[in-house]
């Protein structure tokens, strides 16, 4: 199934490209080896980009300003978009998602890019 467009997701092209680049790195399990980024859903990441969640990794890989994707997720929910991007970045509704592996995060991100909807519960059923 093809990805939704940046416009359909309410993202800028750089934000969209950063998420797609992050998906590729997560699916390959190569954040650390290729980009010097450790994955951890509990930590957005600093400007140094050493330990990051999905959003922080995307900002680092896409050379986006620190916190810009978190701001975008918050703004999207205010402008009629669902809370899906915000819930992808901050999965408070699925406590296990805070311990997601790169593989599980990739499933969650791929689902979001394909459907525009967040589904951490489904992603967490993916074997580690």
Regions found by a protein language model. Name each.
Residues 2-128:
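Catalytic phosphate/metal-binding cores of nucleic-acid and nucleotide-processing enzymes, i.e., regions
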